[in-house]
Amino acid sequence: MRPLKQATPTYSSRTADKFVVRLPEGMREQIAEVARSHHRSMNSEIIARLEQSLLQEGALQDNLGVRLDSPELSLHERELLQRFRQLTHRQQNALVALIAHDAELAQA
């Protein structure tokens, strides 16, 4: 006799974790405007921005020890890393956001 298949839990808005956030005055409208420009819901916009922020923090923490002379890096990776490190923090964030946005478009 075969064992019964167990249902794989599926993600839905009903089963998702919920968290109430108090936004400063005017921020809700700003988020709505940006979400419209990216053709996504406010929830999706907020999630995308939180994910990007968490990824950036994780990447920075994980890659603090990456050296330009590391044998793990290709020539192109060394050049990109060197140029990236020369950018201001604001420019780095903008570049990462641009790359993330392009990746989202490619997946759509």
UniProtKB/Swiss-Prot annotation:
UniProt cross-references to SUPFAM superfamilies, sorted A to Z: Ribbon-helix-helix
Phenotype of the disrupted gene, per the record: Deletion strain produces no detectable surface pili. Also abolishes mucoidy and algD transcription.
Swiss-Prot/TrEMBL keywords: Activator, DNA-binding, Repressor, Transcription, Transcription regulation
GO molecular function, one term: transcription cis-regulatory region binding
GO BP terms, alphabetized: bacterial-type flagellum assembly; negative regulation of bacterial-type flagellum-dependent cell motility; negative regulation of DNA-templated transcription; negative regulation of single-species biofilm formation on inanimate substrate; positive regulation of cell motility; positive regulation of single-species biofilm formation on inanimate substrate; regulation of polysaccharide biosynthetic process; type IV pilus-dependent motility
GO cellular component, one term: protein-DNA complex
Domain characteristics, as noted in the entry: The C-terminal is essential for tetramerization as well as efficient AmrZ-mediated activation and repression of its targets.
Assembly behavior: Forms homotetramers (via C-terminus).
Function, as annotated: Functions both as a transcriptional activator and a repressor of multiple genes encoding virulence factors as well as genes involved in environmental adaptation. Plays a role in alginate production via the activation of AlgD which is the first gene in the alginate biosynthetic operon. Also regulates the transcription of genes responsible for type IV pili localization and twitching motility. Mediates transition of P.aeruginosa biofilm infections from colonizing to chronic biofilms through repression of the psl operon.
Protein name per the record: Transcription factor AmrZ
Species in which this protein is naturally found: Pseudomonas aeruginosa (strain ATCC 15692 / DSM 22644 / CIP 104116 / JCM 14847 / LMG 12228 / 1C / PRS 101 / PAO1)
